[in-house]
């Protein structure tokens, strides 16, 4: 066999290499079979040997190495790939620039609506924000002002806190997608729970706070849900244990407990739509409708009216707005039950009041509700109003008792009812039930406490970058002063048509008081009317003016409240301001006497010419006094409007 191979006379180097391989093969304990197989392999190799001694297999491996080198096609991107990557980067930068421009424009836009959050969101976890770093983080029960919709996943708005700027807010669709992704990751983590229980529990713990379970209990449904939180947190601990028996034992119990929990939270949205400005509601020290409570709250209303003049709307609500629960308004099957119950307010009336409160809040003015039926914070906890609850508290029951008894026998006979109501308010958890607690002994201190809170809230809702005239304010005030019929509109297009904005604007009273300061002559003529008006205002106990309240139950009566005084302005003006006309007449008589004296001094002149001259002067003075009266007529009318719209204190304090 060897002689037949060597007969081909291979080169010397190849023979030496082959002899070394044969020695190595013979040293291995392979036996005769191994030597025989090697001989066959040697013959197969020698068939593909080249002239330089290299085999064909070597050349093949070398070609493979050269294909995998850095010069190959696969390791170096082509020109088309580079251009595609550059196009994507350019598109991304352009989209980011447009998003930044839209964000800047939204700073000057009015607030479209407001929401209260039911979930926690951390912006650090997101990388698909339209403008990197401009997403807004928030906790549960925070409030957001939404300016506009950017796309399906993002809104543009801001967190209602002082110092927070505008940014991107995740939409409910995006939050729902995030929740589904977290659930999928949690399910995938269960496969590795038997090996690494600690890791799966920590990742699940990161998911849970951002889910709906972080919502503080604000209703009976939420209280039940959070009551099941502890049970559910204990049950997954057994699920994560490596013992298989624990799963079989606790799974029926866990299904029974977790089914109602997931059923309740399944319909809980991430956001609740609330008024753009949270309405302020006063409760305490006892029941409304009794003199002690009404007297103390009335003092606070008067203080707020003058402290925040031009920035506040105080409105009286007679409907039972505690019926405006989200579960009732969103469920038509419950409407019949409410209608059949012995409530003094229908659902249509309640819905109308809620819409009116939302409309008032769109102006971004402070909204204060004088709600007759609200005596406890739980009455509004399930509604969509999200009010600022102010608790007027008398710490000592004995002091409250003495106050009630001091109001007379008619109030003292209802002492027990008022004391029970005060005790129920005192039992409420203060941090969860009330936003402000006024427990000061002096009225001035309590007023300043409330004013400080509302000033901070005003700054939180009115950032410096967005302090521009609100078109919704003028639109709402203009719509509230529209007459009901065309005849009234035609009657009001005269001199009173110019005064319509002054009546609706909150600054009308101050403007009416500043107008006499412009011309001293006008002020001297109408000093008696100003004194009479001020005396009347002080006699009414600084009542709330109707221009800041909508104190009737239906929309028609609210509109008529703005129109009815307009019909009687001419008669009221004639009856009340007769002294002005007498004052002007005396002035006119005095001027005519002066002309007669001048006529006697110049009697030597032509009598006909003097008489013509005197007639011209008389007509001019009469015309001037008439114009002066017309100028003051607007002021007189505006004062009369404020006077006619003020509430009588005896009527306000309900017996």
Swiss-Prot record:
It holds the Pfam family Guanylate_kin. Regulated through phosphorylation at Thr-549 by CaMK2D. It is a peripheral membrane protein. Disulfide bonds: none annotated. CDD domains: SH3_CACNB2. Residues 62-81 have a biased composition (Polar residues). The modification Phosphothreonine is found at residue 549. GO terms for molecular function: actin filament binding; high voltage-gated calcium channel activity; voltage-gated calcium channel activity involved in AV node cell action potential; voltage-gated calcium channel activity involved in regulation of presynaptic cytosolic calcium levels. The record marks 544 as: Required for CaMK2D-binding. It is found in: Cell membrane, Sarcolemma. Residues 593-604 have a biased composition (Basic residues). GO terms for biological process: calcium ion import; calcium ion transmembrane transport; chemical synaptic transmission; membrane depolarization during atrial cardiac muscle cell action potential; membrane depolarization during AV node cell action potential; positive regulation of calcium ion transmembrane transport via high voltage-gated calcium channel; positive regulation of muscle contraction; protein localization to plasma membrane. Beta subunit of voltage-dependent calcium channels which contributes to the function of the calcium channel by increasing peak calcium current. Plays a role in shifting voltage dependencies of activation and inactivation of the channel. May modulate G protein inhibition. May contribute to beta-adrenergic augmentation of Ca(2+) influx in cardiomyocytes, thereby regulating increases in heart rate and contractile force. Involved in membrane targeting of the alpha-1 subunit CACNA1C. This is Voltage-dependent L-type calcium channel subunit beta-2. It comes from Mus musculus (Mouse). The lineage of its organism: Eukaryota, Metazoa, Chordata, Craniata, Vertebrata.
């Amino acid at each position: 066999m060897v002689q037949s191979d060597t007969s081909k006379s291979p080169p010397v180097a190849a023979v030496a290499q082959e002899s070394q391989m044969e020695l190595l093969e013979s040293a291995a304990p392979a036996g005769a079979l191994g030597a025989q197989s090697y001989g066959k392999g040697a013959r197969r190799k020698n068939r593909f040997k080249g002239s330089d001694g290299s085999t064909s297999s070597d050349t093949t491996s070398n070609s493979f190495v050269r294909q995998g080198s850095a010069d190959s096609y696969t390791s170096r991107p082509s020109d088309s790939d580079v251009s595609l990557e550059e196009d994507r980067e350019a598109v991304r930068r352009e989209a980011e620039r447009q998003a930044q421009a839209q964000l800047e424009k939204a700073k000057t836009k009015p607030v479209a609506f407001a929401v209260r959050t039911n979930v926690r969101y951390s912006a650090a976890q997101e990388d698909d924000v339209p403008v990197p770093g401009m997403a807004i983080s928030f906790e549960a029960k925070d409030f957001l002002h939404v300016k506009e919709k950017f796309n399906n996943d993002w809104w543009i708005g801001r967190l209602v806190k002082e110092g927070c700027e505008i940014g991107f807010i995740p939409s409910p669709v995006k939050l729902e997608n995030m929740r589904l992704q977290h659930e999928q990751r949690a399910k995938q983590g269960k496969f590795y729970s038997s090996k690494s229980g600690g890791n799966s529990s920590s990742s699940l713990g990161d998911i849970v706070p951002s889910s709906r379970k972080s919502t503080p209990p604000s209703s009976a449904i939420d209280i039940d849900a959070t009551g099941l939180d502890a049970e559910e947190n204990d049950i997954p601990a057994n699920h994560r244990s490596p013992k298989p028996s624990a799963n079989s034992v606790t799974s029926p119990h866990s299904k029974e407990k977790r089914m109602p929990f997931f059923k309740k939270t399944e319909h809980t949205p991430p956001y609740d739509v609330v008024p753009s400005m949270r309405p302020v509601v006063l409760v305490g020290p006892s029941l409304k409708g009794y003199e002690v409570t009404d007297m103390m709250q009335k003092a606070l209303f008067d203080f707020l009216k003058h402290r925040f003049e031009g920035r506040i709307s105080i409105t009286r609500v007679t409907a039972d707005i505690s019926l405006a629960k989200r579960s009732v308004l969103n469920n038509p099957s419950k409407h019949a039950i409410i209608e059949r119950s012995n409530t003094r307010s229908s659902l249509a009336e309640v819905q109308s009041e809620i819409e009116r409160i939302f409309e008032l809040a769109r102006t971004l003015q402070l909204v204060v509700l004088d709600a007759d039926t609200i005596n406890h914070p739980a009455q509004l906890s399930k509604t969509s109003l999200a009010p600022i609850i102010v608790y007027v508290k008398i710490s000592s029951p004995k002091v409250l008792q003495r106050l009630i008894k001091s109001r007379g026998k008619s109030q003292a006979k209802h002492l027990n009812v008022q004391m029970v109501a005060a005790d129920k308010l005192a039992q409420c958890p203060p941090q969860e039930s009330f936003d402000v607690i006024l427990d000061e002994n002096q009225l001035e201190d309590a007023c300043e406490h409330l004013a400080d809170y509302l000033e901070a809230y005003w700054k939180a809702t009115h950032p410096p970058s967005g302090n521009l005239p609100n078109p919704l304010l003028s639109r709402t005030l203009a719509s509230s002063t529209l007459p009901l019929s065309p005849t009234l509109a035609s009657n009001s297009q005269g001199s009173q048509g110019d005064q319509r904005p002054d009546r609706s604007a909150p600054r009308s009273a101050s403007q009416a008081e500043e107008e006499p300061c412009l011309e001293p002559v006008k002020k001297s003529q109408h000093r008696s009317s100003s004194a009479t008006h001020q005396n009347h205002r002080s006699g009414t106990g600084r009542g709330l003016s109707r221009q800041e309240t909508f104190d009737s139950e239906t929309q028609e009566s609210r509109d008529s409240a703005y129109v009815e005084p307009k019909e009687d302005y001419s008669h009221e003006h004639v009856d009340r301001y007769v002294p002005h006309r007498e004052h002007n007449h005396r002035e006119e008589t005095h001027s005519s006497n002066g002309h007669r004296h001048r006529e006697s001094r110049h009697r030597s002149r032509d009598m006909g010419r003097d008489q013509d001259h005197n007639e011209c002067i008389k007509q001019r003075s009469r015309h001037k006094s008439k114009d002066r009266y017309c100028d003051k007529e607007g002021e007189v009318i505006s004062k009369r409007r404020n006077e006619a719209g003020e509430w009588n204190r005896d009527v306000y304090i309900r017996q």
